[in-house]
């Protein structure tokens, strides 16, 4: 048995680098006041908790997170959630883009982000770099990914998912030979170019039946690089800014690029619609495609020590409710409510993600706000909300209707406190929606 086949030794010499993304334009306005990895998820987590938890469960504990803008809340979350003991070398550290004399620009892409901090990564005595994305929802054992990389003596290994004819045109596809080596790339091909990218996915371990239904493989944007290979490629292609579109396809002819099949739930949640759908899919019965209820590979986050949720004479169906909520005489269906959510009486919440609050307001504080004609945090009585995302600390008044009654697909109403994306109303963090408002 090779020494690295022991799980602990297998990943000890791996450094994880999580790419937090750019300005988060696809998730705006959820990224207006926070970095993309800090966007709340599933009522109590944040996007960054997914790749960090996968790393910890895979015993990879040297982790950097690269981010671009608004990193204050991300820094705070990381420092409170992942403070490793001083008796081991594990860490999770946020590295924000810096403008220097040598690098006057922000990160220009995935490869550029890594290039700008290569001086720091070089200091670590490791064999591989594990490059991860910060806006995907999945559960993966990276130790098996690294093992495949070493067994095939790959220079770069790409994690891939099998996809069908419907999804393939929207993804970056690749072709492989009989040994699983990647031979060709195509970004979002159509028509004949799409059909030319069909491969026998049974080569990577799919059953014949599944391989027939999923004749394409798509990149997940997750890579293992040999240390020196990454250094050399970033220097060779010094003008290239993106791994998936430039550096990796350009290196295929003279490097051993291997595919590692991931045949489980994986979702890119980097857009408002995908993020919304993935959150509500967690309520699916009897079991969702992705579950946070997995003791063998838990998803970690910051411990908050909140009290249990209180529900008074309410009807709640097909929903997830975070800790510390107060729900009074209302109806909630197919929704996710985040921590400290407060829903007053006679409300109807359907097909909605409510992110909750960062704080509680005492009864006296709420009475004072009411006396001044102001609106308390939470959702006021008699309000109806359907197909929406309510960001944190929103103050929604009484008898408000957030239902997109005109079925508008896209709208920018920042001055009024909301956007509409793909027909989903997104109420901005910290805004106030007046009593009786109809959206």
Swiss-Prot record:
One of its GO terms (cellular component) is carboxysome. Pathway: Glycan biosynthesis; glycogen biosynthesis. It catalyses: alpha-D-glucose 1-phosphate + ATP + H(+) = ADP-alpha-D-glucose + diphosphate. One of its GO terms (biological process) is glycogen biosynthetic process. Keywords: ATP-binding, Carbohydrate metabolism, Glycogen biosynthesis, Glycogen metabolism, Nucleotide-binding, Nucleotidyltransferase, Transferase. Coiled coil: none annotated. InterPro entries: ADP-Glc_PPase (IPR011831), ADP_Glu_pyroP_CS (IPR005836), GlgC_bac (IPR023049), NTP_transferase_dom (IPR005835), Nucleotide-diphossugar_trans (IPR029044), Trimer_LpxA-like_sf (IPR011004). Its EC number is 2.7.7.27. PANTHER family: GLUCOSE-1-PHOSPHATE ADENYLYLTRANSFERASE LARGE SUBUNIT 1, CHLOROPLASTIC-RELATED, GLUCOSE-1-PHOSPHATE ADENYLYLTRANSFERASE-RELATED. Belongs to the bacterial/plant glucose-1-phosphate adenylyltransferase family. This is Glucose-1-phosphate adenylyltransferase. It comes from Synechocystis sp. (strain ATCC 27184 / PCC 6803 / Kazusa). The lineage of its organism: Bacteria, Bacillati, Cyanobacteriota, Cyanophyceae, Synechococcales.
